[in-house]
């Protein structure tokens, strides 16, 4: 009976993805139906993980020729070093190699220096190449070396400064998170005849190094991994293997026809109209799928759950290789055992 704690809760049937204007960076993701209260619980947890716990890449320090500290200015460069650093913080990177790595910019004026002027190396890609870093006047020369690394969340400039940092190396605050903005909304929704469910909508914006769908998938995986320590029991057996000598890979009860169950006429007709013939067909259905059956409501659902519970079964079970090719022959063979 322990499985009832989670098996009888309704679960979302699919994740609907609505791409934004830039599908690689923006999307709205909708999950429904959820049990009442789960929209807020999951929405808040996923938002916090998305904003703080995903791996990304960022510039962690810069060294500019003839510059000793961040309050300096560079001859022929309109921006001062502080403004250049602020612009470097907004450079978006995709990094497929272990850091730290060194990149460089070498430019001559007159010119508008952008992220696209960063000399890329294998395994590192600049995503927002049009992003402006600074402006050079005629005759100006600019050479800078950038240190890039991977990490998560926010790391202060102080922590990004190496112990053996050379004179002129300026550490930069690093915001590693590839997710730039997340918001969520919870609205009531219906499933079949039941109105008391949640619909969770997440709007996710990324820097382009990861798609919103993948970002949400990674966040859910992190949450799943963190919660695993709290599960202190083994999963109960599914509707699989029973006796060694019956020749079956599943419980023979699954071969029993649903019209032999003591169900109300309404419930029986709903199953018939949905082409559910055997108990094996029935138990693989989820609550959400059942509630989408025409004229099938919560009363019928509870009736079926009670009948299945008395047989040691429940909705949402997994049966491998169902239905067997010779299902009618097997049903007749085991008919007397019912």
From Swiss-Prot:
SUPFAM superfamilies: C-terminal domain of RNA polymerase alpha subunit, Insert subdomain of RNA polymerase alpha subunit, RBP11-like subunits of RNA polymerase. Pfam families: RNA_pol_A_bac, RNA_pol_A_CTD, RNA_pol_L. It comes from the Bacteria. GO terms for molecular function: DNA binding; DNA-directed RNA polymerase activity; protein dimerization activity. SMART domains: RPOLD (SM00662). GO terms for biological process: DNA-templated transcription. It catalyses: RNA(n) + a ribonucleoside 5'-triphosphate = RNA(n+1) + diphosphate. CDD domains: RNAP_alpha_NTD. It is an enzyme of class 2 (transferase). Residues 1-234 are annotated as: Alpha N-terminal domain (alpha-NTD). DNA-dependent RNA polymerase catalyzes the transcription of DNA into RNA using the four ribonucleoside triphosphates as substrates. Homodimer. The RNAP catalytic core consists of 2 alpha, 1 beta, 1 beta' and 1 omega subunit. When a sigma factor is associated with the core the holoenzyme is formed, which can initiate transcription. This is DNA-directed RNA polymerase subunit alpha. It comes from Ruegeria sp. (strain TM1040) (Silicibacter sp.). The lineage of its organism: Bacteria, Pseudomonadati, Pseudomonadota, Alphaproteobacteria, Rhodobacterales.
